[in-house]
Regions:
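N-terminal lobe/hinge region of extracytoplasmic solute-binding protein
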Residues: 35-85, 124, 131, 193
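Ligand/substrate-recognition segments at binding pockets and active sites
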Residues: 333-334, 365-431, 504
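Extracytoplasmic/peripheral linker and loop segments enriched in polar/acidic and small residues
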Residues: 313, 325-328, 404-413, 418, ...
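Structural transition elements
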Residues: 198, 334-367, 385-387
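Ligand-site clamp/hinge motif
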Residues: 186-189, 217-270, 402
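Alpha-helical secondary-structure segments
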Residues: 115-120, 154, 196-197, 227-232, ...
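Long beta-strand-rich cores associated with HINT superfamily self-processing modules
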Residues: 506-531
Length: 531
């Protein structure tokens, strides 16, 4: 009976998918189709908090600057900019050929050009408590901003912040039209008007989202051809990952992102190569991802083992990261054996962590000799990482540490971690912007959770001094030197145990051309075409 239900469910999803794709009369070879198994909650850039929101928002909106596939800052609506010698004043010259998507709210012409005052409005809105954007923190370093004229926008910082352009590349900082938001209010989330390569067509929430080509889009490719190439983007919302995978194998989705445990062995060999039976049908793309998976200690926990540097160091030494990646991830990812900062960013201390079971056992033995009881720790995770935590549980038992694994829903885990209710937790840190400061901020004492990302409540005066010096340092080489010192100091105290640095991995149909990957796993569709 259960098998019959699953078959009927899949038939229903297939019929739904077919009927949805037929409803838009566009050549199939010009429609890019993907599934989002998590629901999009908003198409408003002020709420571009998670990948499922950011991906469609990135097709609909533009900001002052953008990142290329190598994380280099590139022009977007700003065609050029200058930075004052003291690092406090950023002046942007705006393009004159950027227009909002068509809307009757613009009046007779149905559109208008973007001007500098639109960025003043967009930034005001991002900070507005009534909007309650989770991205308001992006402008914390900003003292003021103004429109000098229609095509010049100036930002004044409180203190120098060398990573500021990276912050501005986030979709939180996209430009939005005041006329449309004044009309729709909070319903702008489902009635977005932007400037991006695609415009909003239709959204049947939890079913399908359709975007269409913006024929007035301002960007061109390196050969001078207008972007985008595609006529439409069709996003399905099928929550079952197995059903998504089946549709992909049937050619009804153009790509899938990431690698789920339920089908990793079907697609990949144990060494991480694409299985030979799929080489004629699929392309695999993979590369560094600015995402560090780790376990964190809440250092104010009552458990004395958590407060013991010996126990934290023993855990860091007591499991084989290489085996973990091979066994659980088919070698997708890199063992995190050199600190918290992932591959692709400057600033790691470069000092490797050995796998040393004997030293780990000795550290546990010394802890017990000095009056401690056998360490018993509770590690909290969500269901997606249960296999990882059970691996750690087995390995650490071998060095004399007992781990109890508890599973919480993702939202509950996030809340409990932020409020200091978990003595030991599994977490991820995905870069918001491409600078090592983004990672090192997790150990700055003024960033204690729940108001900041220092979930461990690590506090060290020397670290804080180095962090503040780095923020005010405009010389890249000196700033990176401070980053290395901070990374080394944090590694020596072990407030967190880095597990692995993730990789972006995507599988695409052979007829998909122009798909690139980048270390922040942003989906860029303006340069994609289908044969």
């Amino acid at each position: 009976m259960q098998k019959r239900r699953l078959i009927l469910h899949f038939i229903y999803l297939t019929i739904l998918f077919y009927s949805c794709t037929q409803s838009d009369k566009v050549n199939e070879n010009t429609i890019f189709r993907y599934n989002e198994y998590r629901n999009v909650t908003s198409l408003d850039p002020a709420f571009a908090r998670n990948p499922q929101n950011i991906w469609p928002i990135n097709q609909l909106f533009n900001g002052l600057v953008q990142l290329d596939k190598n994380l280099t800052i590139q022009p977007e609506i700003a065609k050029a900019w200058t930075i004052s010698p003291d690092g406090l004043t950023y002046q942007f010259s705006l393009r004159k050929d950027v227009f909002f998507h068509s809307s009757p709210l613009f009046g007779e012409n149905q559109t208008r050009a973007v001007v500098a005052s639109d960025f003043v409005y967009s930034f005001d809105r991002l900070k507005d408590p009534k909007v309650a954007s989770p991205g308001g923190w992006v402008l914390q370093q900003v003292e003021s901003y103004k429109a000098n004229d229609q095509h010049t926008f100036t930002i004044q910082l409180k203190t120098p912040f060398p990573a500021f352009l990276g912050l501005l590349s986030m979709r939180y900082c996209a430009v939005v039209p005041h006329e449309v938001i004044s009309y729709y209010g909070s319903s702008f989330r489902s009635n977005p008007i932007g400037t991006g390569p695609f415009y909003f067509k239709r959204w049947d929430e939890n079913v399908k989202l359709v975007l269409r080509k913006n024929t007035r889009y301002f960007e061109k490719d390196v050969k001078g051809r207008k972007l985008p190439y595609l006529e439409a983007v069709s996003i399905q919302f099928i929550p079952d990952i197995q059903s998504e995978f089946m549709l992909f194998l049937q050619g009804k989705l153009d790509f899938i992102n990431s690698l789920d445990a339920s089908y990793k062995d079907e697609l990949l060999t144990p060494t991480g190569a694409l299985q030979s039976k799929y080489k004629e049908r699929l392309n695999m793309l993979k590369g560094p991802y600015l995402n560090t998976e780790y376990i964190g200690f809440y250092l104010n926990a009552s458990n004395p083992a958590i407060q013991s540097k010996k126990i934290r160091e023993a855990i860091n030494l007591g499991f084989d990261r290489n085996l973990m990646i091979a066994y659980l991830r088919n070698n997708i990812g890199y063992p995190a054996n050199q600190g918290f900062i992932p591959k692709g960013l400057k600033g790691t201390s470069g000092t490797p962590f050995p796998y040393d079971v004997e030293k780990a056992r000795n550290l546990v033995a010394k802890y017990i000799e000095e009056g401690g009881e056998k360490p018993i720790l509770t590690l909290t995770t969500d269901a997606n990482y249960l296999d990882l935590c059970e691996y750690l549980q087995r390995e650490l038992q071998k060095i004399g540490i007992d781990i109890k694994v508890e599973v919480l829903p993702t939202a509950s885990l996030r809340q409990a971690k932020s409020s200091g209710k978990l003595e030991l937790f599994r977490a991820s840190w995905i870069a918001d912007y491409p600078d090592a400061e983004n990672y090192l901020s997790l150990f700055y004492s003024k960033n204690f959770s729940p108001n900041g990302p220092n979930y461990t409540h690590f506090k060290n005066k020397e670290y804080d001094t180095l962090y503040e010096e780095a923020l005010s340092t405009l010389t890249d080489s000196l700033r990176v030197k401070r980053y290395r010192q901070m990374d080394s100091l944090a590694n020596s105290e072990h407030p967190i145990i880095p597990l692995y640095y993730d990789q972006v991995i995507r599988f695409a149909q052979k007829n998909v051309e122009g798909m690139e990957i980048n270390p922040i796993n942003l989906l860029v569709l303006k340069t994609i075409s289908k044969k």
